[in-house]
């Protein structure tokens, strides 16, 4: 190997990449063709793809039958988005050439990038028919299916790859296998592979995947351990806070669940789901005022956040704060938000506030959506009876009785009303 190339390598290894590239550039004119190929590979590894292409393009013209050079040239062209040119270069390699399977892999990669998954799959199977036990081909098939969301298929090929290698192209095979199993709903099967992946490469994404999957598998303590470790490693990894909070909740640690959700809000202040979850935990442990405040903040982020609205309305209803129910619904309606349950809440609130005309209008509007809801029908019928509207209440009571099957008190009420009308 040329001494200037050796010097350039030493400079880059010492962290002086710019000097290394300059030294390599100075060496170009005195390099033999074999060393030019080495220099091109170094340029590529050090991030100067254009210089790598300049050298390899000339070498490819000089040695068109050197198919390893051809594949490398195509790989460089793919890197600069010259996909059609790369494909044309790859198609010059004959099927009988030892480098042909590699060219098929590169073609498959190209077609996958273009969204032509079936063509990509065909190229990979063609390569596999030549080299049946090559882990790189199995891994490429796994990656193809993984990219398509066909996780069960991906599992098959990642498992085969994992028997031979734990890493390919800088990708941890055990992590990919674990992710595929988890995405397939095979949470328990994913756990041992996540354990291996975290041992080999404890990066935040792998730890998160492990913790999240452990929670899905019901291994709550493992989930808490992994997600807590991740929080310590990178507290700004916002996705960890919801599953960690839910893990604490599953252990009955509601205070810790609330605390964790609020920590998450500090890093992800526009996450309405975290506000809602924190509110539910606050309400669960009797912190009603804090719960209401968190729900109001969730609604400030999204006035149409239905679950937060329903939760806050339920709190107001439990606290018999009927004015707040009316004010909240009127406010969200002013934003153009609507939900069938609003009329039911309004009907109940107006009834309690003795605003009977408004209550009747709200019941009538709600009936369009809740005519098959037993609790609504009973409440509506009770309101009508209180208002002396027995004739209107009667069909509702009969419907409730039909749903209940047997209800002596209800039967007596119906008979009494029918008797009054028969006189």
Swiss-Prot record:
Cell membrane among keywords: no
SMART domains: TPR
InterPro entries the record matches: CellSynth/LPSAsmb/PSIAsmb (IPR051012), TPR-like_helical_dom_sf (IPR011990), TPR_rpt (IPR019734)
Keyword Repeat among UniProt keywords: yes
TM regions (residue ranges): none
Keywords tagged on the record: Repeat, TPR repeat
Bridged cysteine pairs (disulfide): none
TPR repeats by residue range: 33-66, 67-100, 135-168, 171-204, 238-271, 272-305, 306-339, 340-373, 374-407
Domain of life assignment: Bacteria
Pfam families in UniProt: TPR_15, TPR_19, TPR_8
Self-association state and partner proteins as the record states: Interacts with the RNA polymerase core.
Protein name: TPR repeat-containing protein YpiA
Lineage of source species: Bacteria, Bacillati, Bacillota, Bacilli, Bacillales
């Amino acid at each position: 190997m040329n001494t200037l190339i050796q010097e350039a390598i030493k400079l880059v290894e010492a962290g002086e990449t710019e000097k290394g590239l300059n030294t390599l550039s100075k060496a170009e004119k005195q390099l033999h063709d074999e060393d030019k190929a080495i220099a091109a590979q170094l340029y590529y590894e050090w991030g100067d793809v254009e210089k790598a292409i300049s050298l390899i393009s000339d070498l490819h013209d000089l040695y068109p039958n050197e198919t390893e050079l051809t594949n490398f040239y195509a790989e460089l062209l793919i890197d600069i988005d010259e996909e059609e040119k790369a494909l044309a270069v790859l198609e010059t390699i004959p099927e009988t050439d030892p480098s042909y399977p590699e060219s098929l892999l590169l073609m498959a990669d190209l077609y996958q990038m273009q969204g032509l998954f079936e063509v990509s799959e065909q190229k990979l199977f063609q390569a596999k028919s030549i080299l049946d036990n090559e882990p790189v081909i199995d891994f490429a098939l796994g990656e193809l299916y993984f990219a398509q969301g066909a996780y069960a298929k991906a599992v098959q090929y990642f498992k085969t790859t994992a028997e031979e290698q734990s890493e390919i192209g800088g990708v941890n095979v055990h992590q990919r296998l674990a992710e595929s199993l988890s995405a397939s709903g095979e949470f328990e099967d994913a756990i041992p592979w996540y354990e291996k992946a975290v041992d080999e490469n404890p990066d935040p994404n792998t730890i998160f995947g492990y913790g999240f999957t452990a929670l899905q598998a019901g291994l709550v303590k493992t989930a808490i351990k992994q997600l807590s470790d991740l929080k310590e490693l990178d507290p700004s990894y916002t996705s960890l806070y919801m599953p960690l909070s839910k893990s604490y909740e599953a252990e009955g640690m509601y205070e810790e669940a609330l605390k964790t959700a609020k920590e998450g809000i500090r890093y992800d202040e526009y996450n309405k789901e975290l506000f809602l979850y924190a509110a539910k935990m606050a309400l669960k442990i009797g912190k009603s005022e804090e719960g209401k405040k968190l729900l109001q903040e969730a609604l400030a982020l999204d006035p149409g956040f239905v679950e937060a609205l329903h939760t806050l309305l339920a709190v107001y209803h439990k606290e018999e704060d009927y004015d707040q129910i009316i004010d909240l619904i009127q406010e969200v309606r002013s934003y153009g938000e609507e939900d069938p349950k609003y009329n039911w809440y309004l009907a109940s609130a107006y009834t309690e506030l003795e605003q009977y005309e408004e209550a009747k209008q709200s019941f009538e509007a709600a009936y369009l959506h809740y005519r098959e809801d037993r609790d609504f029908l009973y409440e509506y019928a009770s309101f009508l009876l209180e208002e002396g509207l027995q004739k209107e209440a009667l069909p509702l009571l009969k419907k409730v009785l039909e749903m209940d099957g047997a209800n002596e008190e209800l039967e007596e009420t119906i008979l009494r009303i029918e008797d009054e009308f028969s006189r």
